[in-house]
Protein backbone atom coordinates (compact mmCIF):
# COMPACT_ATOMS: atom_id res chain seq x y z
CA UNK A 1 0.00 0.00 0.00
CA UNK A 2 1.24 3.45 -0.91
CA UNK A 3 -0.80 6.63 -0.90
CA UNK A 4 0.75 10.08 -0.79
CA UNK A 5 0.22 13.74 -1.57
CA UNK A 6 3.26 15.87 -2.37
CA UNK A 7 3.92 19.30 -3.84
CA UNK A 8 4.89 19.26 -7.51
CA UNK A 9 8.17 21.10 -6.91
CA UNK A 10 9.29 18.59 -4.27
CA UNK A 11 8.40 15.69 -6.57
CA UNK A 12 10.18 17.32 -9.52
CA UNK A 13 13.33 17.99 -7.47
CA UNK A 14 13.35 14.36 -6.36
CA UNK A 15 13.01 13.01 -9.89
CA UNK A 16 15.51 15.48 -11.36
CA UNK A 17 18.18 14.47 -8.85
CA UNK A 18 18.04 10.86 -10.05
CA UNK A 19 17.18 11.25 -13.75
CA UNK A 20 20.42 13.12 -14.48
CA UNK A 21 22.11 9.71 -14.17
CA UNK A 22 19.55 7.00 -15.03
CA UNK A 23 16.32 6.52 -16.98
CA UNK A 24 14.71 4.11 -14.53
CA UNK A 25 15.14 3.31 -10.86
CA UNK A 26 13.85 1.39 -7.87
CA UNK A 27 12.02 3.35 -5.18
CA UNK A 28 12.00 1.90 -1.68
CA UNK A 29 8.76 2.79 0.08
CA UNK A 30 9.70 2.96 3.75
CA UNK A 31 7.32 3.94 6.53
CA UNK A 32 9.41 7.05 7.26
CA UNK A 33 10.06 8.09 3.65
CA UNK A 34 11.37 7.19 0.19
CA UNK A 35 14.85 5.95 -0.65
CA UNK A 36 16.48 5.71 -4.08
CA UNK A 37 19.98 4.54 -5.00
CA UNK A 38 21.17 4.21 -8.57
CA UNK A 39 24.32 4.06 -10.69
CA UNK A 40 24.65 5.01 -14.33
CA UNK A 41 25.30 2.24 -16.91
CA UNK A 42 29.03 3.05 -17.06
CA UNK A 43 29.44 2.78 -13.27
CA UNK A 44 30.86 6.31 -13.16
CA UNK A 45 28.15 8.29 -11.37
CA UNK A 46 26.04 7.23 -8.38
CA UNK A 47 23.16 8.84 -6.53
CA UNK A 48 21.75 8.15 -3.08
CA UNK A 49 18.52 10.01 -2.28
CA UNK A 50 16.29 10.14 0.78
CA UNK A 51 12.96 11.99 1.02
CA UNK A 52 11.41 12.02 4.49
CA UNK A 53 7.70 11.38 4.99
CA UNK A 54 7.53 14.87 6.52
CA UNK A 55 8.21 16.34 3.05
CA UNK A 56 4.76 15.11 1.95
CA UNK A 57 1.38 16.65 2.68
CA UNK A 58 0.31 13.11 3.54
CA UNK A 59 2.19 9.83 3.32
CA UNK A 60 0.99 6.29 3.99
CA UNK A 61 2.68 3.02 3.16
CA UNK A 62 3.20 -0.41 4.64
CA UNK A 63 6.51 -0.71 2.81
CA UNK A 64 7.44 -2.07 -0.58
CA UNK A 65 9.58 -1.65 -3.67
CA UNK A 66 8.51 -0.26 -7.03
CA UNK A 67 10.31 0.33 -10.32
CA UNK A 68 9.61 3.48 -12.33
CA UNK A 69 10.42 4.97 -15.72
CA UNK A 70 11.78 8.34 -14.63
CA UNK A 71 11.30 10.18 -17.91
CA UNK A 72 7.60 9.25 -18.06
CA UNK A 73 7.04 10.15 -14.43
CA UNK A 74 8.88 13.45 -14.95
CA UNK A 75 6.69 14.26 -17.95
CA UNK A 76 3.59 13.71 -15.83
CA UNK A 77 4.92 15.72 -12.88
CA UNK A 78 5.84 18.48 -15.32
CA UNK A 79 2.14 19.01 -16.06
CA UNK A 80 1.73 20.49 -12.58
CA UNK A 81 2.55 24.03 -11.53
CA UNK A 82 5.14 24.37 -8.76
CA UNK A 83 2.60 24.98 -6.02
CA UNK A 84 0.13 22.29 -7.04
CA UNK A 85 -0.31 19.04 -5.18
CA UNK A 86 0.25 15.66 -6.80
CA UNK A 87 -1.70 12.65 -5.50
CA UNK A 88 0.02 9.26 -5.81
CA UNK A 89 -1.82 5.98 -5.25
CA UNK A 90 -0.33 2.54 -5.88
CA UNK A 91 -2.60 -0.21 -7.22
CA UNK A 92 -0.80 -3.31 -6.04
CA UNK A 93 -2.90 -5.73 -8.09
CA UNK A 94 -2.27 -4.09 -11.45
CA UNK A 95 1.19 -2.74 -10.45
CA UNK A 96 0.23 0.70 -11.67
CA UNK A 97 0.66 4.10 -10.08
CA UNK A 98 -2.37 6.37 -10.24
CA UNK A 99 -1.43 10.05 -10.36
CA UNK A 100 -3.89 12.93 -9.94
CA UNK A 101 -3.07 16.59 -10.57
CA UNK A 102 -5.88 19.14 -10.27
CA UNK A 103 -8.45 17.00 -12.09
CA UNK A 104 -6.00 15.34 -14.47
CA UNK A 105 -5.76 11.58 -13.99
CA UNK A 106 -2.81 9.48 -15.13
CA UNK A 107 -2.10 5.79 -14.80
CA UNK A 108 1.58 4.89 -15.00
CA UNK A 109 2.61 1.29 -15.60
CA UNK A 110 5.43 0.34 -13.26
CA UNK A 111 8.56 -1.63 -14.13
CA UNK A 112 9.49 -4.95 -12.54
CA UNK A 113 12.19 -3.95 -10.02
CA UNK A 114 14.10 -7.15 -10.81
CA UNK A 115 14.62 -5.92 -14.38
CA UNK A 116 16.27 -2.69 -13.21
CA UNK A 117 20.02 -2.40 -12.78
CA UNK A 118 21.23 -3.53 -9.36
CA UNK A 119 21.58 -0.77 -6.82
CA UNK A 120 25.12 0.26 -5.89
CA UNK A 121 26.77 0.28 -2.49
CA UNK A 122 28.27 3.71 -1.98
CA UNK A 123 31.74 3.02 -0.57
CA UNK A 124 32.76 4.61 2.70
CA UNK A 125 35.81 6.59 1.56
CA UNK A 126 38.33 8.33 3.79
CA UNK A 127 38.81 11.50 1.74
CA UNK A 128 41.45 14.05 2.72
CA UNK A 129 39.63 17.33 2.06
CA UNK A 130 36.16 18.61 2.82
CA UNK A 131 34.60 21.86 1.64
CA UNK A 132 31.16 23.39 1.86
CA UNK A 133 30.36 25.50 -1.19
CA UNK A 134 27.33 27.32 -2.56
CA UNK A 135 25.52 25.65 -5.43
CA UNK A 136 25.95 28.78 -7.55
CA UNK A 137 29.75 28.48 -7.27
CA UNK A 138 29.62 24.90 -8.53
CA UNK A 139 27.47 26.14 -11.42
CA UNK A 140 29.97 28.91 -12.17
CA UNK A 141 32.89 26.46 -12.11
CA UNK A 142 31.19 23.95 -14.40
CA UNK A 143 30.07 26.66 -16.84
CA UNK A 144 33.58 28.12 -17.05
CA UNK A 145 35.23 24.72 -17.53
CA UNK A 146 32.72 23.77 -20.22
CA UNK A 147 33.94 26.64 -22.39
CA UNK A 148 37.35 25.03 -22.88
CA UNK A 149 37.33 21.31 -22.09
CA UNK A 150 35.37 18.11 -21.54
CA UNK A 151 37.26 17.35 -18.32
CA UNK A 152 37.50 19.23 -15.05
CA UNK A 153 40.01 18.95 -12.22
CA UNK A 154 38.83 19.65 -8.68
CA UNK A 155 41.36 20.11 -5.91
CA UNK A 156 42.29 21.57 -2.56
CA UNK A 157 45.62 23.18 -1.73
CA UNK A 158 46.12 22.47 1.97
CA UNK A 159 49.01 24.93 2.34
CA UNK A 160 47.19 27.93 0.87
CA UNK A 161 43.83 26.71 2.20
CA UNK A 162 41.90 27.07 -1.04
CA UNK A 163 39.68 25.08 -3.38
CA UNK A 164 40.52 25.21 -7.07
CA UNK A 165 39.09 24.20 -10.42
CA UNK A 166 41.23 23.57 -13.51
CA UNK A 167 40.16 22.85 -17.08
CA UNK A 168 42.65 22.52 -19.93
CA UNK A 169 41.57 22.64 -23.55
CA UNK A 170 43.54 22.38 -26.78
CA UNK A 171 44.15 26.12 -26.83
CA UNK A 172 42.48 27.68 -23.80
CA UNK A 173 42.61 27.02 -20.06
CA UNK A 174 40.40 27.93 -17.11
CA UNK A 175 41.55 28.25 -13.50
CA UNK A 176 39.32 29.25 -10.60
CA UNK A 177 40.29 29.60 -6.95
CA UNK A 178 38.03 29.96 -3.93
CA UNK A 179 39.69 30.81 -0.62
CA UNK A 180 38.45 29.95 2.85
CA UNK A 181 36.62 33.31 2.88
CA UNK A 182 34.83 32.44 -0.39
CA UNK A 183 33.64 29.09 0.94
CA UNK A 184 31.09 28.29 3.62
CA UNK A 185 33.56 25.90 5.25
CA UNK A 186 36.91 24.26 4.52
CA UNK A 187 38.68 21.31 6.13
CA UNK A 188 41.94 21.41 4.18
CA UNK A 189 43.87 18.41 2.93
CA UNK A 190 45.76 18.03 -0.33
CA UNK A 191 43.41 16.75 -3.01
CA UNK A 192 43.35 16.66 -6.81
CA UNK A 193 41.23 14.54 -9.14
CA UNK A 194 40.15 14.77 -12.77
CA UNK A 195 36.52 14.16 -13.74
CA UNK A 196 34.34 13.90 -16.82
CA UNK A 197 32.65 17.27 -17.24
CA UNK A 198 29.55 15.71 -18.81
CA UNK A 199 28.69 13.92 -15.57
CA UNK A 200 29.38 16.95 -13.43
CA UNK A 201 27.25 19.12 -15.74
CA UNK A 202 24.34 16.72 -15.34
CA UNK A 203 24.67 16.60 -11.56
CA UNK A 204 24.93 20.39 -11.48
CA UNK A 205 21.51 20.65 -13.16
CA UNK A 206 19.90 19.10 -10.09
CA UNK A 207 21.82 21.05 -7.43
CA UNK A 208 19.88 24.13 -6.26
CA UNK A 209 21.90 27.31 -6.81
CA UNK A 210 21.18 28.40 -3.23
CA UNK A 211 22.11 25.02 -1.73
CA UNK A 212 25.00 24.47 0.64
CA UNK A 213 26.90 21.59 -0.95
CA UNK A 214 29.35 19.54 1.08
CA UNK A 215 32.11 18.23 -1.19
CA UNK A 216 34.60 15.51 -0.19
CA UNK A 217 37.78 15.19 -2.26
CA UNK A 218 40.99 13.14 -2.34
CA UNK A 219 44.00 12.39 -4.54
CA UNK A 220 42.69 10.60 -7.64
CA UNK A 221 39.64 9.52 -5.64
CA UNK A 222 35.93 9.91 -6.33
CA UNK A 223 34.26 13.15 -5.31
CA UNK A 224 31.24 13.01 -3.04
CA UNK A 225 28.71 15.84 -3.02
CA UNK A 226 25.93 16.12 -0.44
CA UNK A 227 23.07 18.62 -0.46
CA UNK A 228 19.55 19.04 0.88
CA UNK A 229 16.28 20.05 -0.78
CA UNK A 230 12.61 20.27 0.21
CA UNK A 231 13.44 22.49 3.19
CA UNK A 232 15.95 19.98 4.50
CA UNK A 233 13.56 17.03 4.33
CA UNK A 234 15.23 15.62 1.23
CA UNK A 235 18.92 14.71 1.00
CA UNK A 236 21.05 13.75 -2.00
CA UNK A 237 24.55 12.30 -2.22
CA UNK A 238 26.30 12.12 -5.58
CA UNK A 239 29.50 10.19 -6.08
CA UNK A 240 31.55 10.58 -9.26
CA UNK A 241 34.49 8.35 -10.12
CA UNK A 242 37.65 10.08 -11.35
CA UNK A 243 39.47 9.70 -14.61
CA UNK A 244 42.83 8.23 -13.67
CA UNK A 245 45.58 10.40 -15.12
CA UNK A 246 48.52 8.67 -16.79
CA UNK A 247 51.99 9.80 -15.86
Curated annotation (Swiss-Prot):
GO biological process assignments: leading strand elongation; regulation of DNA replication
Q: Which domain of life is it from?
A: Archaea
Q: Which residues form a coiled coil?
A: none
Q: Name one GO molecular function term.
A: DNA polymerase processivity factor activity
Gene3D superfamilies, per database record: 3.70.10.10
Quote the SUPFAM superfamilies the UniProt record gives: DNA clamp (SSF55979)
Keyword annotations: DNA replication, DNA-binding
What InterPro entries does UniProt report for this protein, alphabetically?
DNA_clamp_sf, Pr_cel_nuc_antig, Pr_cel_nuc_antig_CS, Pr_cel_nuc_antig_N
By sequence similarity, the record places it as follows:
Belongs to the PCNA family.
The function of this protein is: Sliding clamp subunit that acts as a moving platform for DNA processing. Responsible for tethering the catalytic subunit of DNA polymerase and other proteins to DNA during high-speed replication.
Q: Which PANTHER family match?
A: PROLIFERATING CELL NUCLEAR ANTIGEN
How is this protein organized at the quaternary level? Homotrimer. The subunits circularize to form a toroid; DNA passes through its center. Replication factor C (RFC) is required to load the toroid on the DNA.
Q: What is this protein called?
A: DNA polymerase sliding clamp
